[in-house]
Amino acid sequence: MSLKNQDVYAEERIKLMVEYNEISFKNNGKLKLLIIVGTRPEIIRLAAVINKTRKYFDVILAHTGQNYDYNLNGIFFKDLKLADPEVYLDTVGDDLGATMGNIIDKSYKLMVELKPDAVLVLGDTNSCLSVIGAK
């Protein structure tokens, strides 16, 4: 699916969810949505969704830092016209276990602090697996 088609699909899906009351608004008319990414594939796949959800939700975008490097991720934010993440969790540890533990710990603390109405992750990465553990 092209990025243009993804963009249209994301907007139409959100409109339908609102129309059929799958989403009930609060917080001044907007649900608080925490979106957590950690890798390039997650950023690319979620770009259209992130941009469209900002219209309908109070979105907080967090980056785990799993693969953070301007050449690996930062350039995609610019090219996909995404705002920089509001939160960098800086979770990289000395090994895989430490990194995953840091993602669980820091994403849990972020969820406790922000109290989002929903959390969105997409993918099969260590970031997604660990965030699910924190939820």
Residue ranges and their predicted role:
Residues 58-99:
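Conserved nucleotide-sugar phosphate-binding/catalytic loop shared by glycosyltransferases and other
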Residues 34-37, 42-49, 76, 88-135:
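Active-site and donor-binding regions of nucleotide-sugar-utilizing enzymes
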Residues 7-66:
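N-terminal subdomain of nucleotide-sugar transferases
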Residues 1-2:
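Non-catalytic N-terminal targeting/anchoring module and adjacent flexible stem/linker
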